[in-house]
From Swiss-Prot:
Catalytic reactions of this protein: Na(+)(in) = Na(+)(out); K(+)(in) = K(+)(out); Cs(+)(in) = Cs(+)(out); Rb(+)(in) = Rb(+)(out)
GO biological process per UniProt: bicellular tight junction assembly; calcium-independent cell-cell adhesion via plasma membrane cell-adhesion molecules; cell adhesion; monoatomic ion transport; paracellular transport; regulation of intestinal D-glucose absorption; regulation of intestinal lipid absorption
Tissues of expression: Detected in colon (at protein level).
Origin species: Homo sapiens (Human)
Region annotated Disordered, chain positions: 208-228
UniProt KW Phosphoprotein keyword: yes
Annotated site location: Important for the formation of tight-junction strand-like structures: M68
Protein's job: Forms paracellular channels: polymerizes in tight junction strands with cation- and water-selective channels through the strands, conveying epithelial permeability in a process known as paracellular tight junction permeability. In intestinal epithelium, allows for sodium and water fluxes from the peritoneal side to the lumen of the intestine to regulate nutrient absorption and intestinal morphogenesis.
Annotated keywords: Cell junction, Cell membrane, Disulfide bond, Ion transport, Lipoprotein, Membrane, Palmitate, Phosphoprotein, Tight junction, Transmembrane, Transmembrane helix, Transport
Protein name (Swiss-Prot/TrEMBL): Claudin-15
Domain of life according to the entry: Eukaryota
Family matches, as PANTHER family: CLAUDIN
Positions on the Extracellular side per record topology: 25-74, 141-159
Site (Important for Na(+)-selective paracellular ion transport): residue numbering on this chain: D55, E64
Gene behind this protein: CLDN15
Amino acid sequence: MSMAVETFGFFMATVGLLMLGVTLPNSYWRVSTVHGNVITTNTIFENLWFSCATDSLGVYNCWEFPSMLALSGYIQACRALMITAILLGFLGLLLGIAGLRCTNIGGLELSRKAKLAATAGALHILAGICGMVAISWYAFNITRDFFDPLYPGTKYELGPALYLGWSASLISILGGLCLCSACCCGSDEDPAASARRPYQAPVSVMPVATSDQEGDSSFGKYGRNAYV
């Protein structure tokens, strides 16, 4: 049962990592509909790297942000958190492949495989937390500006990439928790643990010779012809 949970957790963590990788370059982190000028610009959508605008004919133009230092602090932090989440998830994926019990890489014992699987699970949990913090922080700034009546700039709404990122972070955390469960039961099911115990020779108690046995042995020593 634990092997099935471990394999399922690895599958969930892999899916979460792939979804995080799709979320990062997605263009629809925030979307805004501009009602004032429907001839030239209809919709503006942005992500962490660039901004795009579509006109009424369906033609869109994209441009990257001009300077990283000129960006808001939360956008720079979200970039760093998302990249960190993907790197942690990728490292956890490599350790998870080596730590699964259904794989045979390097001839590792089950106890060591359990430790590798638990480490991979912890990395996936950290990756999910980093992604969750980045996306929630970005969404908080969108909603704060949207409900601020004194905000002079363009107001945006939550884009579909944020919902994808929230789902990816949650899946990564759940997959990491399933992988961490292997650390608890991996050592108990290790058949090689008993083989590593030191050898103990069996203790046998020698019987003490009685007087009758001594008499028989002395009689047998002289033989029958000695008394004839």
